[in-house]
């Protein structure tokens, strides 16, 4: 059964401050944002369609929003990563809690690093770890 209250709470973790953290870090300009879109067989909470400032090359950034289950969020990010140039998990935890999770769970750390997943604390509105750029080709069929 769908917990609509939880979905509404998670959507509140995404705002202009979070968006600007991502855009400024990567030097992108926003073209559009999409909420709760299906890509492949999976739903993505937020998709940012951006372009580079110099050459205006389009890029796609996927974002998974979670209240506090970082393991589930990273697992979902991995399942969706192949469709996006960057992928972020935005989670409502303090930075210290996020860092503890990463250091206490070596598999979680390896997954985050291996897939280039970025982490943002919605609680503190700060980037913990930036997402790495990946060349992707599958997204074009869905977004561009």
Spans of features found by a protein language model:
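Short connector loops at helix/strand junctions that flank enzyme active sites
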Residues: 41-43, 56-60, 82-84, 114
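Conserved catalytic cores of phosphodiester-cleaving nucleases, focusing on short active-site segments
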Residues: 46-50, 58-67
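Acidic-basic catalytic patches of nuclease active cores, encompassing PD-(D/E)XK
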Residues: 1-43, 49-55
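Phosphate-binding glycine-rich loops and adjacent basic patches that engage nucleotide phosphates
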Residues: 34-39, 61-71
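Residue-level detection of beta-strand scaffold positions
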Residues: 44-49, 84, 131-132
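Non-catalytic C-terminal interaction segments of nucleic acid-processing enzymes
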Residues: 1, 20, 52, 109-144
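Catalytic cores of nucleic-acid endonucleases
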Residues: 66-120
């Amino acid at each position: 059964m769908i917990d609509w209250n939880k979905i509404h709470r998670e959507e509140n973790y995404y705002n202009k401050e979070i968006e600007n953290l991502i855009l400024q870090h990567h030097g992108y300009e926003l073209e559009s944002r999409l909420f709760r879109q299906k890509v492949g067989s999976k739903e993505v909470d937020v998709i940012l369609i951006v372009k580079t400032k110099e050459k205006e090359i389009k890029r796609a950034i996927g974002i998974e929003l979670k209240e506090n289950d970082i393991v589930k969020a990273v697992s979902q990010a991995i399942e969706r990563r192949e469709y996006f140039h960057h992928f972020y998990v935005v989670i409502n935890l303090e930075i210290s809690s996020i860092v503890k999770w990463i250091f206490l769970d070596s598999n979680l750390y390896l997954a985050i690093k291996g897939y280039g997943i970025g982490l943002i604390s919605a609680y503190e509105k700060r980037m913990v770890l930036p997402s790495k750029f990946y060349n992707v080709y599958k997204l074009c069929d869905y977004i561009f």
